[in-house]
A protein has these predicted regions:
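Active-site-adjacent beta-strand/loop module that shapes the phosphate/pyrophosphate-binding cleft
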Residues: 50, 111-134, 165-171
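Conserved hydrophobic/aromatic beta-strand scaffold that supports enzyme active sites
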Residues: 45, 55, 122-126, 145
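NUDIX/MutT-family hydrolases
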Residues: 126, 135-167, 188-196
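Conserved N-terminal beta-strand and adjoining loop/helix that marks the start
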Residues: 28-54
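Extreme N-terminal basic, low-complexity initiation segments
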Residues: 2-10
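Conserved Nudix-box catalytic region and its N-terminal flanking loop in Nudix hydrolases
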Residues: 52-91, 188-201
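A short coil-to-beta-strand element that immediately follows conserved catalytic motifs
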Residues: 97-107
């Protein structure tokens, strides 16, 4: 009886196997778990009569020791709206009594995997009312007014420096929405999802 020939097997190209493995294996930042906590917050962009912006040197995480607009997280367990949250934070941190009509929704920012710990959704409000008095120190940090041209020289979060501040100024008086896919070593990927120019100021 004649034996059948065994089917030929494909040969492995060992020269290319390294490249194949690199293509197959994601980077450590691409396997970031998507089940991170998702937090919703507001930021308040307040100005005085001279056009200086009020910033908070944060005493709490995240971004401890960095300058950023004041604000805080929504009370999601009671269904708090972003506008109500912004008014509450203005009163708690700065002693300002605001209502939603005093706020202009300047932008919405979503961040995937910020610092590898949290997904964020942030509502950016410009306060229409001028702030004349510097708020006193607060457990969240200390306040100071800065002219626009000084902000770049401050210690501010990388995402603020990369796009949030530039887009805030570019679309001031209008609106913008953007998404940031945060990576390690400040290699962030930004997508501007919507924008409308405003009057600017």
């Amino acid at each position: 009886m004649k034996r059948r020939a065994a089917p030929s097997k494909g040969k492995i190209n060992f020269e290319n196997i390294g490249a194949l493995l690199l293509d197959f294996c994601p980077s450590p930042f691409e396997i970031l778990p998507v089940s991170l906590p998702y937090k919703i917050a507001t930021l308040l962009y307040c100005f005085n009569a001279e056009g200086e912006v009020l910033l908070l040197e944060r005493a709490q995480e995240p971004n401890r020791g960095f300058w950023s607009p004041p604000g805080g997280k929504l009370k999601m367990d009671v269904g708090e709206s972003p506008y109500v949250c912004a008014c509450r934070e203005a009163q708690e941190e700065m002693g300002l009594n605001l209502n939603p009509a005093d706020l202009h929704l300047a932008g919405i920012i979503s961040e995937f995997g910020y610092q590898g710990r949290t997904h964020w959704l942030m509502f950016l409000f410009e306060v229409r009312v001028k702030v004349e008095l510097l708020p006193p120190p607060h457990p969240e940090g200390r306040f100071e007014f800065f002219p626009r041209e000084k902000i770049a020289g401050l210690k501010i979060p990388q995402t603020d420096r990369e796009q949030i501040w530039p887009w805030f100024w570019q679309y001031r008086g209008g609106f913008f929405a953007a998404h940031c896919h945060c990576h390690g070593e400040n290699q962030n990927q930004w997508t501007l999802e919507e924008s409308r120019t405003g009057s600017g100021k």
